[in-house]
Regions:
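A structural signal for well-ordered alpha-helical segments within the folded catalytic domains
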Residues: 55-62, 136-140, 168, 184, ...
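Aromatic-enriched alpha-helical interface/lid elements that frame and gate functional surfaces
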Residues: 117-196
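Flexible, small-/acidic-enriched active-site or ligand-binding loops
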Residues: 221-269
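Active-site-adjacent "lid/gating" segments in soluble enzymes
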Residues: 1-129, 133-134, 141
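Active-site rim elements
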Residues: 51, 129, 174-176, 243-246
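Short linear loop/turn motifs
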Residues: 153-165, 200-209, 267-270
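A glycine-rich dinucleotide-binding beta-alpha-beta segment and adjacent secondary-structure elements
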Residues: 191-242
């Protein structure tokens, strides 16, 4: 079983006009429609993390695992091909079906959701706070916590469709409450009742006790630099917990070992 990740795929799995073109993360994000869905209207916006690289890698890993399982059953090998462009199309699948069903063309959703409201970030006293109410019961819980029970029967807000039509009023109503509280206060008030959480920066992440318990900030020894923290392993196994044991090898670290496999020995250090 072997695999490739290319910008636009291998000829063997689908020959198109782009197969030989080079690509990077930003190109995959742009062509796959991700940037059109992100940011404000008519202002395509790139994601901070390199998802145009990361998503194809994750999909390729799943493909290799599936191919290995098939090889165990049949004794036959397989070639796994992942296109960065294809991966971003699959990642942004909502735009595909919405265009087919209702001819909707995404022009930047900002921090809102086109089908659910409220589902955004709101100004807090010391930053921003995310709130998402996908269920009516969650909306009812939110207005109760805000002390606005009278909104339960307000025709502008008594259904998800109504809230989508009156999105600006919803935002104004929620923001008038959230901006009176810090992110920590909002967490205490909403925790376990309404899906919500602070818009963290990396300093906030380093202080989060939950991540420490989850072992998501792991220490590794970096040659010449000592102990440094990196992101931990998000896939947890109960019987065989995993961790990051060491940093990635430096350039040329395995050159001697690889060359010796081909019978080339007594190599100079350079």
């Amino acid at each position: 079983v072997y695999a490739t990740i290319r910008g636009y795929g291998d000829y063997r799995t689908g020959k198109g006009p782009y197969n030989d073109w080079p690509a990077f993360d930003i190109v995959a994000q742009a062509m796959g429609g991700f940037m059109a869905m992100t940011g404000e209207k008519d202002s395509p916006t790139k994601a901070g993390p390199g998802i145009g690289d990361i998503v194809p890698g994750i999909m390729c890993a799943f493909g290799v695992i599936a191919a290995l399982r098939k090889a165990e059953q049949t004794g036959q090998g397989e070639f796994v091909d992942v296109s960065m462009y294809d991966a971003m199309i699959a990642f942004c699948e909502r735009q595909i079906y919405r265009y087919s069903f209702v001819e909707d063309v995404s022009h930047g959703e900002g921090n809102d959701h086109p089908l659910v409201n409220p589902f955004s970030i709101y100004r807090a006293a010391d930053g921003w706070y995310a709130i998402g109410c996908a269920l009516e019961s969650q909306w009812q819980a939110l207005i109760k916590i805000m002390g606005l029970d009278e909104l339960k029967d307000d025709n502008r807000l008594n259904s998800n469709d109504a809230r989508i039509k009156n999105a600006e009023f919803v935002r104004k109503t929620i923001t008038e409450w959230t901006r009176l509280h810090t992110k920590a206060q909002l967490m205490n008030k909403l925790a376990g009742k309404v899906p919500s959480g602070p818009a963290n920066n990396v300093e906030d992440i380093y202080k989060d006790e939950h991540l420490k318990v989850r072992d998501m900030l792991q220490d590794i020894d970096v040659p010449g630099l000592g102990k440094k923290k990196i992101a931990g392993v998000p896939v947890k196994f109960l019987r065989n917990p995993g961790s990051v044991k060491s940093p990635g090898p430096q350039l040329g670290f395995h050159t001697k070992e690889v060359m010796e496999q081909f019978g080339i020995k007594n190599m100079k250090d350079d």
